[in-house]
């Protein structure tokens, strides 16, 4: 995934990668009970729709190794990309999960902000 901050702040929903708070396509597939391949197709479609600038800033292609040690594509998504992707997920359960994600994005951003404001020892 990316750099984890510390275990007391780490969330299974969102995490930090290169200073950005993100989630990924694997988490989205698991939480929203979708096939990861289908989530990848949805992500790629959104990237085409939103264009290069927004897509490049908010969707980052990455990889992971599956249980058979094969390299598999995945995407890291910013809060904006996540919101765009799951906007159409409208079941009662999906709405509840979207709220949990929003709270986690907010909490993680606040944590990072607080860490940046902590004075460093001389």
Task: Indicate where each model-derived feature is located.
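An anion-engaging/catalytic patch
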Residues: 1-120
